[in-house]
Amino acid sequence: MRSVELIESWPVENVGTAVVSSDGQVVASHGDLERVFPLASVSKLLTAYAALVAVEEGAVGLDDPAGPEGATIRHLLAHTAGYDFSERTVRAAPGDRRIYSNVGFEVLAETIAERSGIDFASYAHEAVLVPLAMTSTDVSGSPAAGASSTVMDLARFAAELQRPTLLHPETVAEAASVVFPGLDGVVPGFGRQRPNDWGLGFEIRDGKSPHWTGAQSSPRTFGHFGQSGTFLWVDPEAQLACVALSDRDFGPWAAEVWPTFTDAVLAEHRR
């Protein structure tokens, strides 16, 4: 795919990308594939996946109480527990608003650690990184934004998201479906979205505009982007996933080039 070469025009020093088909094959890649990049909020995808493993293993349940009074694991994953973005203050009743929250993911990890008896970084490492051979990925930092990884490690994770081996496919399908539909909210860097649909840790594109995915991305596209200049999306209708990691913080440059890049990848794939 020649479209991956578009990253050469991005105003960044180091960048890499990989495109992964639904059968788990890396069909195209370009740039710094083994460089370790900070993931920022793309970390939430790994945290959410480990949390879902904990659910399937019975360490926690999606409807177990967690966080503010009346909130559950499900609320924390879907950014509807009512927490502020960065402070442990409650701004809304559970389920009333979609407030994107790093704190919610920190509380999620603390809850799983408490109930499993294993610190969350170790749990995530053994539950996700080891079986997927993500040997260059580190999840010892903040579960909301502190992981680091490589393009090729995240390509393995993108393959897992499309053809799950660690979770039942039904669990991943639920995670990639809207939870608490109809709630408005803000996608950082892209403003208020009505509605701001989210799954169990996965942001869902639906009809959001503007957005970090492409105009040609299907409404079912899910994934996450990070303020460190990173993203991972899965488009179930295109049967394709894409990872891009860079070393320049998100800003207007990314809001401009990422959608164009995604549309080019999808267009070439569909030809």
What does each model-found stretch correspond to?
Residues T221-R271:
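Structured C-terminal helix/loop/strand segments within mature extracytoplasmic catalytic/sensor domains
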Residues V19-S21, L62-A66, G201, H211, ...:
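Glycosyltransferase-associated regions of secretory-pathway enzymes
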Residues S142-A145, V151, S177-E237, R271:
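Active-site Gly/Thr loop motif
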Residues L132-A133, D153-R156, E160-R194:
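Penicillin-recognizing serine hydrolase domain
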